[in-house]
Amino acid sequence: AQCLVGSEMCIRDRYTDFPETENLIACILPMDTAVFRFPFRIKMQGDTVAIMDLHGMDHFIHLFHYPDLSYITSLGKRGDSPEEMLSVENIRWNGNSLWVLDANGLKLTRFGLALSNDSLLREEAVSLDKEILRGLDFVIYDDSTFIIPDYSGESRFCWVDRTGRLLHKMGIIPTTNEEALKHARPALAQAWRSFIDYNPRNGILAAVTQLGEVLEIYNLKDSTHIVRVGLHGEPEFKVAEGYGIPTGIMGFSDVQVMDTAIYAVFQGDTFEDISRKMQKGDMTDG
């Protein structure tokens, strides 16, 4: 069904199941080193694997050869000096360069291949405009532009140039919660925190919510915006002292836009279930 979200027209529909399902079988690859505390993202480029450690002690990113997973080096040193990082939210390859988002440090850093071709060196740091409130994900739109979710609640995405300057904002949170849109946009934006991905070959930008079950598909070539809402609905939250406190489920944790399909990782556990598992010491899902 077509709907008007703020001043934006979008196609909104619900889904209850998937017409086709497939089972994936994984194999365990032993590693000769243990450097992780909380491995959260894996990005491949050729025969190099970059693994992001969300809570790294000394470094946030570790490089390995593929397929033998032999250790190469670690980068993204933890610390508060200008060349170190306070946090890492996501990593993205762009050719032979690896871009890294440090939300707490308000910067994007580019690591490029060394002359030996077996390690990465820090080559560029982009300080983000202070109007961008704690960007927690990013995609590379082209060689001069990044797209970062807008957590102010004013819009859906921020377009940022290669110098970190905010170019413009796009879209609006596609919620049916008109009360939150009017009176609690920062809390609404927190609840609608999304993981994003972009495929430059087809112009598709996808966003999936960390809470609830909402998938957004933006076709940046023709400005089409599709919102698909699953059985668990929109992110559920309550407002406490201006913050959005989650009350529903943990939803998606990653999304990948390919040429003919969009893949997303979904959890679906309620916060009550998660609390019970933690009390029992069951941390199978992290």
Predicted regions and their residues:
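Beta-strand-rich domains and repeat architectures in extracellular enzymes and scaffolds
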Residues: 28-59, 265-267, 273
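Surface-exposed loop and turn segments in beta-propeller and other repeat-based domains
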Residues: 24-32, 73-84, 123-131, 167-191, ...
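Single conserved hydrophobic/aromatic residue that forms the stacking wall/gate
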Residues: 1-6, 10-11
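Short, conserved, GDST-rich strand-edge loop motifs in beta-rich repeat architectures
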Residues: 265-285
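Beta-propeller blade signature
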Residues: 159-161, 219, 278-286
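Asp-box/WD-like beta-propeller blade repeats and closely related beta-sheet repeat scaffolds
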Residues: 105, 113-144, 149
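Structural signature of eukaryotic scaffold interfaces centered on beta-propeller domains
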Residues: 40-43, 90-93, 137-142, 186-201, ...
